[in-house]
Amino acid sequence: FCHNQGKDSCSRGLRDKKTNAFRQTAFGVDMAGCPLEEKISEMHLAKTDGNFVGALAMAVVDNPMVAGTGHRICNDCMKSCIYQKQEPVNIPMGETRTLRDVLELPWGFEIYSLLTRWNLLNIRRPVPLAESGYKVLVVGLGPAGFTLSHHLMNDGHAVVAIDGAKIEPLDPRYSGVTP
């Protein structure tokens, strides 16, 4: 595991030893690592120890909307993996597998929801703030829109979010809620 040696380039980026600048891919893209600075190596360590709820708790500190990212959106962490000369670790798929393992538990959806709102590993804000009295409308529910909505809710604001596309309810086997 890379974080024990301070080489978790997937989180912090792959740097040139001489200039300390980010290395670049063959296409000229900086290998800057995870834009959220997610604790990826720590998450994998918890997962391999069999603690997949702990692994998810570690991931959602920096990326509470891991359900919408994972292998679907970003792979900057893979581009910066120190195992470039071999096959890089498929970090986004590991995130997704960890989330699925938790969602398949009894009360799995509730566990994930709880970790995104009340997470004791999140030292900056382990619990949501009190109600602020503000009401916010978020238009557009792409990755930025639903992440903004989440953070606004944790800041104590009442949030209504709309999107141009039809939004389907989550499968009842995951949410426990029958529409």
Go through the PLM ranges and name each one.
Residues 48-51, 174-179:
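N-terminal FAD cofactor-binding segment of flavoenzymes
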Residues 134-160:
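N-terminal Rossmann-like FAD-binding beta1-loop-alpha1 element of flavoenzymes
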Residues 1-130:
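Ferredoxin-type iron-sulfur electron-transfer modules and their immediate structural context
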Residues 157-177:
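Glycine-rich FAD pyrophosphate-binding loop
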Residues 98, 106, 111, 143, ...:
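General N-terminal targeting signals
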Residues 95, 150-151, 171-174:
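Short acidic, glycine/serine/threonine-rich loops at helix termini
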